[in-house]
């Protein structure tokens, strides 16, 4: 493969629904790129029209069904010196959207990858959810099959960080019901739909309450679901901690090992547990 000169892959952050959110850099790259790969070429044409941008480069489709086939040609074009832009229907490429395979292949070929950052449904939903944003994890779309979905939620039930999911309107009722069953109906959550669009809506409440709300009034449009992390377990009282240490020592553990194990089990400083047993 020829050496890369100015060739590169540029990931474009597209508006979630409001064209006014498009950055100046997005406009510039769309107008100047040699090749633009779009998840939906018709949506790209509408966006370009809304932004009054004339795309001078060649436009090709790039979506889940043709990623494997089209990736090599995009990487080859960038390796030959072309500026190749990738844009999805909304948000950042690679984040539950096409792009990951292209980025991996570009890195493997020594082709530079950069981004023109833009809107993200993940961080937008977090910001408006009213739930803790200091630590979070993005889980993408839950499994479609109920059994696999419940198993995924069971594995996440004790996750302390705020969780963010994408979900389709026709599956959100089942997803909320399974979350309420696995996490408990009172776990706080926010259902965010049609973010930045005219019919934007944020429904907040416990998972059980949201499940009932969705059953009565099914939402439409693109959905981002934000769920609070598992609450911290209450600290056992001093007598219970002493009893745990004593039980471990009776089972053969040394005093030091028993204290270490109890402190680790409850997320407490070792010296705090040691002080209780030394009194």
What are these language model-derived features?
Residues 1-64:
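Glycine-rich, flexible N-terminal cofactor/catalytic loop recognition
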Residues 1-2, 6, 82-83, 162, ...:
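A contiguous loop/helix-start segment that scaffolds small-molecule binding in enzyme catalytic cores
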Residues 30-36, 110-114, 162-163:
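Short active-site oxyanion
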Residues 38, 113-118, 165, 191:
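General beta-strand structural signal in soluble alpha/beta enzymes
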Residues 94-109, 176, 180:
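Short Gly/Thr/Asp-enriched flexible loops that form oxyanion-binding sites at enzyme active sites
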Residues 100-159:
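Class I SAM-dependent methyltransferase SAM-binding "motif I" and its flanking Rossmann-like core
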């Amino acid at each position: 493969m020829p050496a890369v000169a100015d060739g590169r892959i540029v990931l474009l952050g597209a508006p979630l629904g409001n064209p006014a959110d498009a950055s100046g850099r997005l406009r510039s790259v769309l107008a100047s790129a040699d090749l633009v790969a779009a998840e939906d070429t018709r949506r790209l044409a509408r966006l370009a029209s809304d932004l009054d941008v004339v795309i001078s480069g060649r436009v090709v489709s790039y979506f889940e069904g043709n990623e494997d086939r089209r990736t090599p040609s995009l990487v080859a074009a960038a390796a030959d010196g072309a500026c190749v832009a990738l844009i999805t229907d909304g948000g950042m490429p690679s984040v539950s959207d096409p792009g990951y395979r292209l980025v991996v292949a570009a890195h493997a070929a020594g082709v530079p990858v950069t981004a023109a950052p833009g809107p993200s449904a993940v961080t937008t939903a977090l910001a408006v959810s009213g739930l803790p944003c200091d630590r979070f994890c993005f889980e993408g779309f839950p499994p479609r099959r109920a059994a696999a979905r419940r198993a995924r939620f069971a594995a996440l039930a004790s996750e302390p960080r705020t969780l963010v999911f994408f979900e389709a309107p026709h599956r959100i009722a089942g997803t909320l019901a399974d979350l309420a069953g696995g996490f408990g109906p009172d776990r706080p959550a926010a259902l965010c739909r049609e973010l930045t669009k005219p019919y934007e809506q944020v429904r907040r409440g416990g998972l059980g309450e949201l499940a009932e709300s969705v059953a009565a009034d099914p939402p439409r449009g693109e959905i981002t679901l934000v769920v609070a992390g598992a609450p911290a377990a209450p600290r056992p009282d001093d007598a219970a901690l002493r009893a745990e240490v004593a039980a471990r020592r009776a089972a053969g553990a040394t005093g030091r090992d028993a204290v270490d194990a109890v402190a680790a089990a409850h997320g407490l400083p070792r010296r705090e547990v040691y002080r209780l047993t030394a009194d």
